[in-house]
Regions:
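Conserved phosphate-coordination/catalytic loops
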Residues: 80-87, 172, 176, 207, ...
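Radical SAM enzyme [4Fe-4S]-AdoMet core and its adjacent flexible, acidic
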Residues: 2, 149, 153-316, 322, ...
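Residues that line or immediately flank small-molecule/substrate-binding pockets and catalytic motifs
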Residues: 67, 107, 158, 232, ...
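Residue-level recognition of alpha-helix termini/interfacial anchor residues
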Residues: 115, 142, 211-212, 282, ...
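Alpha-helix N-cap/loop-to-helix initiation residues
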Residues: 112-113, 139, 206-209, 343
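Conserved alpha-helical substructure of the radical SAM core
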Residues: 5-153
Length: 384
């Protein structure tokens, strides 16, 4: 439910947002009970992630959607442009408001969705926790509305200091735009005497920045971040993806999205561990963690053995009992990178979809197998 390796993260959440932490714990307790029943059913989900759009205005090199090997940029224009309307999304929020899931807004870049701020306001009016994951490039002009909306958490992706960040993100000047946006967020928070949104900086560890992670410490301090998380790189070998395709036949689905993560990490785990220890040895005004939170030996194996799973980690995935991913076309998926769908919110209410025959079938197969091949590099495996 709350893996020991995540205890520190959960502790800080409890201090900052005790109500949120209590709901998370109770939902995970219920999900664990249903998982052990083995009939494929689940209690209400802890969280729903809404992919508001496939569109993105950046081309970050490591991104599985729009990066060098990204899969989304190979899709048709019709696929990329398809989105749920604001009205369809508010109907969805009405449908799930009775059990108050945590809502995450994601993309693509969610702020490219024209009704994003209005949607946040509606989610908060319904009493739900709302978090947004953004590249931060559009924050400056929307900062006032975002703060006024009541957004709980703003997760902003940053890779390093100015020069290196812009190189990785593929757009000169983007770092300064993000910083200007964060400063506007802080300005409106101070003006309105508001504590929220909490600012969480998210740094993906890649071959481009792993030798310079300390640059993020000064950025986090200057921008008054509440937390700084360094995310270990998601990558797969070709052999794992090929094994995953065997399960595609069983599920009558596709793992095409995983193709965007087939590459060599190019990271020296020994040097990365040195950087990690140096960063964690100092005290800061914001929380810092590395996710997944590996030991030194685990970190080495993670980057050198694509099939590696720590012996201390439960070799089972609880995510489809706890999280629903709703894509821009309305499809409700149990996994980020599988095309398998429980149903479509354009056609029937979410609550009818969540425990329907397709959902129970998927969960039953997953429980029988504990994990699928590609799960070894999915961060959701380490979350629950």
């Amino acid at each position: 439910m709350i893996p020991l390796r995540n205890a520190k993260r959960f502790f800080y959440k409890t201090l900052e947002q005790p109500g949120y932490a209590f709901r998370v714990f109770s939902r995970r307790l219920a999900a664990s009970f249903y998982y052990n029943l083995g009939n494929g059913r689940s209690s209400y989900p802890e969280a729903i992630t809404l992919f508001l759009t496939h569109r993105c205005n950046l081309r970050c090199q490591m991104c599985g959607q729009w990066g060098e090997g990204g899969i989304t940029k190979k899709q048709s224009a019709q696929y990329i442009q398809e989105e749920l309307s604001l009205n369809e999304l508010t109907v969805l929020i009405d449908n799930v408001s009775s059990f108050k899931p945590n809502i995450t807004l994601f993309g693509g870049e969610p702020l490219l969705f024209a009704g994003c701020v209005e949607l946040i306001k509606y989610i908060k009016q319904k009493g739900m926790h709302c978090l947004m994951i953004t590249n931060g490039s559009l924050l400056e002009n929307l900062a006032g509305g975002i703060v006024e909306s009541g957004l709980d958490e703003l997760n902003v992706s940053l890779d390093a200091g100015q020069q290196l960040h812009d190189e990785i993100r593929g757009m000169p000047g983007i770092f300064e735009r993000i910083i200007a946006g964060l400063e506007k967020i802080n300005y409106f928070k101070e003006k309105g005497h508001k504590k929220k949104p909490l600012i969480n900086l998210e740094c993906t560890i890649t071959k481009f920045n792993y030798q310079y992670l300390e640059q993020m410490l000064e950025v986090a301090k200057k921008e008054k971040a509440n937390s700084l998380t360094f995310h270990n790189l998601i990558f797969l070998s070709r052999s794992i993806v090929d094994k995953q395709k065997e399960f595609d036949k069983l599920l009558n689905s596709s793992s095409l999205d995983w193709e965007g993560f087939v590459f060599e990490p190019g990271i020296d785990p020994k040097l990365l561990e040195e950087k990690r220890r140096a960063i964690l040895s100092k005290k800061h005004d914001f929380s810092i963690d590395f996710y997944p939170n590996f030991s030194c030996a685990e970190l080495k194996d993670y980057y050198e053995n694509p099939c590696y799973l720590p012996s201390t980690q439960d070799h089972r995935c609880l995510s489809p009992w706890l999280v629903a991913y709703i894509f821009p076309d309305g499809e409700v998926r149990p996994c980020l990178n599988l095309s398998y769908s429980f149903g479509n919110v354009k056609e029937e209410p979410f609550l009818k979809i969540w425990n329907n025959s397709q959902a129970r079938h998927f969960r039953a197969i997953l429980k029988d197998n504990k994990i699928f091949p590609a799960c070894v590099r999915c961060t959701e495996l380490y979350r629950y």
